Curated annotation (Swiss-Prot):
Residues 1-25, 47-75 are annotated as: Disordered. It comes from Populus trichocarpa. [4Fe-4S] cluster 2 binds at C138, C142, C145. This is Lipoyl synthase 1, chloroplastic. Its EC number is 2.8.1.8. CDD domains: Radical_SAM. Binds 2 [4Fe-4S] clusters per subunit. One cluster is coordinated with 3 cysteines and an exchangeable S-adenosyl-L-methionine.
Length: 376
């Protein structure tokens, strides 16, 4: 689920530091058993995305390359995607704090290209934090995501909600994004733990604005209710890609209609709730398919949409089909706002937890609260 949000004060990272592999082949084979077992499509001119086949598993736990993985030598990474290595005093402070409190952030776990800019505050000095709760190991194996996976991850840390709130309070941020791995192993999908974290933050710092980037909770709308009524300000859940590519890009337990159902329910469950989603580009989608997805999202009242370039974490992940130009991203922003989205963040390095537009979203939250109060 993880991988692509807006936030005010911003630091996104993931604590575990990967050890360098002994060799390229051993790294590829041991990367992630769940992900290696994900769909491996037969070579053909047409792919049946509704009935993917399961790849064979090597004796060492690795998986073979599928027809949608590997590097495409004809698709070169453009200059506009090249980033400097993260550094800076603020970056070091945030990293140390997260390690000390045993907290995870999606910035490091998902290899986000914006980690340096977010943690240091960018040109406007606004730092954005994106904390990842429920551990650092996902029960799903989406083929675009760098977060590690397991069928039976460790149980959630009961101290995580309080530690997260203490960390955020000490940083002095006023807009925080909380995301999580998928936890299909938990009865409520982790929604109760998620809600505890939000409440702990609001108790320590009532004025802080909280955005939650959630899983689909297996379509459990009661779990959605639990989180929506926890005190959060923005409910975010990513559809990730267009309808046709869902079974190729995402874990089979995820789905386009299921994600729409979650977003729709969050919107109607609480008056004034702001909803948000994200779409990756460069996976082989057509312009018409993107427009259809945008129309579906507007039909259920989604307020905020982000577009970003899909970047392949390793050769075992989905191949980049296209590097979309900054000009095309600008087009999608203009088009999205013309059809009614209240805000669209669109750019090659934009991610669902990216720090773009935090001031705008903060103002939007305040306006929505006032409108809801006036109606009631």
């Amino acid at each position: 689920m993880i991988e692509q949000s807006l936030s005010k004060p911003s630091f996104s990272l993931s604590i575990p530091i990967p050890q360098p592999p002994k060799s390229k082949s051993s790294f590829l084979c041991s990367y992630s058993k769940i992900r290696c077992e994900s769909v491996d499509y037969p070579s053909s001119s047409k792919i049946d995305a509704k009935h993917p086949q399961i790849s064979s598993i090597n004796s060492n736990g690795g998986g073979k390359m599928g027809s949608y993985t590997g590097r495409d030598p004809n698709v070169k990474k453009p200059e506009w995607l090249r980033q400097k290595a993260p550094q800076g005093e603020r970056y070091d402070e945030v990293k140390e704090s997260l390690s000390r409190l045993k907290l995870n952030t999606v910035c490091q776990e998902a290899q986000c290209p914006n980690i340096g800019e977010c943690w240091n505050g960018g040109g406007d000095g606004i730092a954005t934090a994106t904390i990842m709760v429920l551990g650092d190991t996902c029960t799903r194996g989406c083929r675009f995501c760098a977060v590690k996976t397991s069928r039976n991850p460790p149980p959630p840390d009961p101290m995580e909600p309080l530690n997260t709130a203490l960390a955020i309070a000490s940083w002095g941020v006023d807009y925080i994004v909380i995301t999580s791995v998928d936890r299909d192993d938990l009865p409520d999908g982790g929604s109760g733990h998620f809600a505890q974290t939000v409440r702990a933050m609001k108790e320590l710092k009532p004025e802080i604005m909280v955005e939650c980037l959630t899983s689909d909770f297996r379509g459990d709308l009661k779990a959605v209710d639990t989180l929506v009524h926890s005190g959060l300000d923005v409910f975010a859940h990513n559809v990730e890609t267009v309808k046709r590519l869902q079974r190729i890009v995402r874990d089979p337990r995820a789905g386009y209609e299921q994600s729409l159902s979650v977003l729709k329910h969050a919107k109607i469950s609480k008056k004034g709730m702001i909803t948000k989603t994200s779409i990756m580009l460069g996976l082989g989608e057509s312009d018409n398919e993107v427009k259809e997805a945008m129309a579906d999202l507007r039909a259920i009242g989604v307020d905020i949409l982000t577009f970003g370039q899909y970047l392949q974490p390793t050769p075992l992940h989905l191949t980049v089909k296209e590097y979309v130009t900054p000009e095309k991203f600008a087009f999608w922003k203009e088009y999205g706002e013309s059809i009614g989205f209240r805000y669209v963040a669109s750019g090659p390095l934009v991610r669902s937890s990216y720090r773009a537009g935090e001031l705008f979203v903060k103002t939007m939250v305040k306006e929505s609260v006032k409108e809801a109060a006036a109606i009631s």
